[in-house]
Structures are given as C-alpha cells and as structure tokens.
C-alpha cells in the first residue's frame, strides 16, 4: 500500500490498463519484501509451499490489489481527499511531568478528508463471514484497542483540533474471495484517550520496575533456577500465530547464561533505528 497510495492519489488520470500495471508494480514491491523476509518469490514458489501458506501468498495479494484499486480509487481521487504522509515516524509526549518520556511509532498513512486529519491503518484478517465479509469479533476489536487509541493520542498531539479519527482500512485475506474490504472509523472521547494515557504510563512503570529488578540481580542471574524479573504472560503465547520464543520458555526456566540455540540470533533491537526517529531530529540515547 505504501507504493500504491501515492500513485492513486496523484492528479494523473489512469486507464484500466494503466491501473493493472500499477497493481503489477505494487505486487513486485510486495514480492521483493516477501523474499527479503525469507520466503520464496512468487515466481519460484512451488504448489506445496503455496498450499501451505495459502491464503497469505503473493498470488492472492495480487488479486486483492486489483479489487482494492477498484474499491478505493474514487475516494483517493476525490477533491475532498489529500494524502499528507506515508509511514511517517512520530514521537509525542506521554507525561507532562516527564519531558524524557515519549510515545513513538509510525503511522501507516496520514491524510486530510473534508478539512479534517485522519490516520489510515491497514489491517488484514482471515476471519471470513459469508454475509460479512468480516466476523463481528474482528470488527469489534478496534475499540477499545491500545494501538488505535495510541494513534489517536498521537494524531491529536500532532494536529490538534484538526485531528478527527483513525480509519482502519480492513482487507479480507481469503483463497477465493478477493474483494472483502471495509473502512472502520474509530473516534474516541478525550476522557477515553486520557484513560489510555494512564494505562500506558502504568505499563511503563511496570517495565521500568522490572528493568531495575533485573539490574539489581546482576551477574547472580546466571546461577538462579529461574529469572525473578519480567514475568511471562502465558495467556498470549499463541496470539498472532504463536510466539517464536515459546520453545525457549519450554527449554529453560532461566535463559540467562545459556548459549544462543541453533536457529536464533542474539542482536540488539532498536526502536530508534527501526522507526527511523532520526528523521524527527531525535538522537539515540546510546550515542550520547
């Protein structure tokens, strides 16, 4: 969608043949990213691998793109619509009493519609309903929703009174149904965003408390039968296709001092680098 939206929002007029070529170019970008993440290119994928991964494969994505262009072109070319940014990073304050605490992330899309500012958030699901096309539990999952509420906080901080809502641009991923799309508008009252702020700051306190406990344990952690810091949330182990580290939890009571097992790589994850926060003029604390 990052490649598609700027093209569709341009003032150029496209023939059906040109729109088809745009979809092909977008799927080429998708396929390149697909390969970069360790999967087989759509051009080289055999039937066994395709059946194993279906419906989340490039071929289905291409069919969806054709339908998506037809479904969204009218809105994106409307004179009421203006695309402002694609994947912009953001950093907004979380606590007026702590100038070092920021909520950071990236927004899928930011656009102006009829004078108001919206965040566009792309979501896919396989939760198909014959007369839907989406199941009710998927449609209801965005309010309340910590991620969406966080984006609402961010857009209000960035754009003030012009900020309006998050539009969840939902797409059904299905083997044969390729035209399942819906825009789910999410607005929240300021009191509800304030509740999200309190929840978030509470979780920040929890993480910082655990970090302090871990720091105090120090090198003694290697000799303990379990790690008395950062408690597990075992009710979430199977969410989003399953936690990739669940096998390590089954293997060890305490991961400290263990050799990195085959198939895993130990590396530093930096949200600063991942989100490209340097674009905002920010500096990574590790460089100071």
Enumerate the predicted regions with their spans:
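Short, solvent-exposed loop/turn segments that connect beta-strands within catalytic domains
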Residues: 14-16, 95-100, 114-116, 159-162, ...
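Residues embedded in well-ordered secondary-structure elements
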Residues: 75, 98-99, 232
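A non-catalytic, helix-rich entry segment at domain boundaries
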Residues: 2-87, 93
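An N-terminal domain-start capping segment
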Residues: 1-12, 134, 140, 157
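Metal-dependent nuclease catalytic regions and adjoining charged, substrate-binding loops involved
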Residues: 140-143, 150-288
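Short, well-ordered strand-loop elements centered on a beta-strand within folded domains, enriched
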Residues: 20, 24, 83-85, 116-121, ...
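Glycine-rich, flexible loop segments associated with nucleotide phosphate handling
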Residues: 18-26, 49-57, 81-83, 102, ...
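Non-catalytic protein-protein interaction segments used by genome-maintenance enzymes to assemble
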Residues: 81, 85-152, 156
């Amino acid at each position: 969608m990052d490649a598609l939206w700027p093209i569709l929002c341009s003032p150029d007029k496209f023939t059906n043949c040109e729109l088809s070529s745009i979809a092909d170019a977008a799927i080429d970008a998708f396929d390149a990213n697909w390969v970069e993440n360790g999967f087989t290119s759509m051009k080289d994928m055999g039937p066994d691998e395709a059946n194993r991964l279906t419906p989340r494969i490039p071929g289905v994505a291409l069919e969806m793109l054709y339908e998506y262009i037809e479904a969204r072109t009218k809105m994106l070319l409307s004179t009421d619509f203006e695309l402002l940014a694609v994947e912009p990073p953001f950093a907004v304050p979380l606590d007026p009493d702590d100038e070092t605490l920021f909520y950071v992330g990236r927004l899928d899309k930011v656009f102006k519609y009829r004078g108001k500012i919206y965040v566009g958030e792309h979501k896919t699901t396989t939760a198909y309903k014959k007369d839907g096309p989406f199941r009710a539990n998927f449609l209801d999952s965005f309010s309340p929703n910590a991620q969406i509420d966080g984006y609402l906080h961010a857009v209000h901080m960035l754009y003030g009174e012009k900020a309006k809502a998050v539009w969840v641009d939902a797409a059904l991923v299905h083997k044969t149904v390729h035209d399942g799309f819906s825009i789910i508008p999410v607005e929240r009252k300021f009191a509800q965003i304030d509740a999200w702020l309190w929840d978030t700051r509470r979780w920040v306190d929890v993480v910082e408390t655990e970090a302090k406990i871990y720091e105090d344990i120090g090198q003694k952690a290697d000799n303990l039968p379990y790690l008395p810091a950062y408690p597990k949330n075992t009710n979430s182990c199977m969410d989003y296709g399953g936690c990739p580290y669940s096998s390590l939890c089954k293997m060890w009571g305490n991961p400290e001092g263990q050799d990195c097992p085959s198939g895993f790589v130990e590396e530093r994850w930096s949200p600063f680098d991942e989100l490209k926060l340097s674009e905002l003029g920010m500096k990574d604390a590790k460089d100071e």
